[in-house]
Regions:
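NAD(P)H dinucleotide-binding glycine-rich loop of Rossmann-like/cofactor-binding domains
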Residues: 78, 117-216
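Receiver (REC) domain switch-region micro-motif
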Residues: 110, 161, 299
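Extracellular beta-rich ligand/substrate-recognition surface
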Residues: 26-36
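Short structural boundary motif marking the start of a folded domain
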Residues: 7, 15-27
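N-terminal glycine-rich dinucleotide-binding loop that anchors FAD/FMN and/or NAD(P) in oxidoreductases
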Residues: 75-82, 138-142, 146, 265-278
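Glycine-rich cofactor phosphate-binding loops and adjacent beta1-alpha1 units
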Residues: 203-219, 223, 228-230, 234-247, ...
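Short Gly/aromatic-enriched secondary-structure transition segments
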Residues: 66-74
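Glycine-rich beta-strand-centered segment in the early N-terminal region that forms part
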Residues: 43-59, 73-124, 157, 167
Length: 314
C-alpha cells in the first residue's frame, strides 16, 4: 500500500472510530425466527483502551445462520436468556482501535475466525464459566457480529481463542485494487472448505489413510449447487490437469443444474478433461446415474439424511 493510501485509510479509521461512539444500526436475532434491524451503542468503557474496536466492511450470508435463527437461545452457541444477538460470521472488518501490544494497528483489514471456544465461556469477557456458552462469531455476542456497523472485542480474546485451538482470531488481509471487499469476506467459507479437503481421507490398497482428495478420483457433490459446494469444487479444481478428478457428479434441482451448465468453473473442468455429470435430484434413476462412470471415491454434502446416505453409498 502506498504512503498516500495508508494515510487515507488511517484518516478514514479515525472518522469511523468517532462514529463508533454514536448510536448505530445492526441486524439482530431477538427470538426464534425473529430478526430485527435495531439501533445499539457500544458501552463507553469500550473506548478506554482495553478493547479492539472494529467496523464491519463486508459480510456473507451462510446457511448455518438458519439454525440459530430457528432455535435462538435453544442453540448451543446462543446464550440462554439473551435479548439480542448480532448476526454475521463470514465478515471482513477494519481495525479502528487496538490495545497496546496487540500487534494490530488502526486501518488494518482483518477476517475474524468464527469459532472461539471449545468450553463454556462468558461471551462478554472471554473467560470460562460453568454456565457459559460455546461462543462463536454471529451466534453469541451482542457487541460483535458482521451485520452490525461497529464491534468491540476484549483484549484477552485473541490469546484465549488461540488457547482453545481455533488459531488466530484476527487474520490480516492485503487488499488489491481489483479485489472487492465482499470477495475478501469469502475468506472464511473458503477456509472451511480448504480445511475440509485437507482432512478428507481415503484408504490405499494397503489400508493406509491417504489425506486429501486423491488425484484422478471420482468426486460427488450431493445437493451440490449451493455456494459452499461450488467453493469446494473451486479448490478441488485448483490443481494441475493431470491431478484433476476423472469424474465429478453434482445433484440438485433442475433449475439450478441448468444454470450450472453455463458456469465458467464447470466449462473449465470439462475443457481440462474432467467429466462433469449434472443429475436431477428428483430423477427416479438417480442411483444408477451416480455410478454411470464409476463409483465415488469422495462424497461431499451439507445434508445428512437417509436419502443422501443411500446416494453416497450407491
Amino acid at each position: 500500500m502506498s504512503e498516500q493510501s495508508a494515510q487515507s485509510v488511517y484518516h478514514r479509521s479515525e472518522q469511523l472510530l468517532k462514529e463508533a461512539r454514536k448510536s448505530h444500526r445492526g441486524v439482530f436475532l431477538t427470538g426464534p425466527n425473529k430478526i430485527e434491524i435495531l439501533t445499539d451503542e457500544l458501552p463507553e468503557s469500550s473506548f478506554e483502551g482495553d478493547y479492539f474496536i472494529t467496523a464491519s466492511l463486508g459480510n456473507c450470508r451462510c446457511a448455518s445462520d438458519a439454525k440459530a435463527i430457528r432455535q435462538f437461545d435453544a442453540h448451543a452457541r446462543v446464550p440462554s436468556g439473551a435479548d439480542r444477538i448480532a448476526l454475521g460470521h463470514e465478515t471482513l472488518q477494519i481495525i479502528l482501535q487496538a490495545p497496546e501490544g496487540s500487534n494490530l494497528k488502526k486501518g488494518e483489514l482483518v477476517v475474524i475466525t468464527p469459532g472461539h471456544s471449545s468450553e463454556p465461556i462468558d461471551p462478554l469477557e472471554f473467560k470460562t464459566v460453568s454456565d457459559g456458552v460455546l461462543a462463536a462469531l454471529g451466534y453469541s455476542y451482542r457487541f460483535l457480529g458482521g451485520l452490525r456497523q461497529f464491534n468491540r472485542i476484549p483484549s484477552a480474546a485473541p490469546e484465549f481463542v488461540r488457547s482453545q485451538g481455533f488459531g488466530n482470531l484476527f487474520n490480516p488481509v492485503s487488499p488489491k485494487e481489483n479485489t472487492s471487499l465482499i470477495s475478501l469476506a469469502h475468506a472464511e467459507p473458503f477456509a472451511c472448505n480448504y480445511g475440509t479437503n485437507k482432512h478428507i481421507f481415503t484408504l490405499d490398497e494397503n489400508g493406509n489413510f491417504i489425506y486429501g482428495v486423491p488425484p484422478r478420483s471420482i468426486v460427488t457433490y450431493l445437493s451440490g449447487t449451493a455456494r459452499m459446494a461450488m467453493i469446494n469444487l473451486t479448490i478441488v479444481a485448483s490443481v494441475a490437469d493431470e491431478d484433476l478428478p476423472n469424474v465429478v457428479y453434482v445433484t440438485g434441482s433442475k433449475s439450478k443444474l441448468d444454470e450450472m451448465e453455463n458456469y465458467a468453473l464447470v466449462n473449465d473442468l470439462r475443457n481440462r478433461g474432467t467429466r462433469v455429470v449434472l443429475v436431477d435430484r428428483k430423477d427416479p434413476d438417480i442411483l444408477n446415474k451416480l455410478t454411470e462412470f464409476g463409483k465415488s471415491d469422495v462424497v461431499w454434502t451439507n445434508y445428512a439424511s437417509q436419502e443422501t446416505y443411500n446416494q453416497a453409498v450407491a
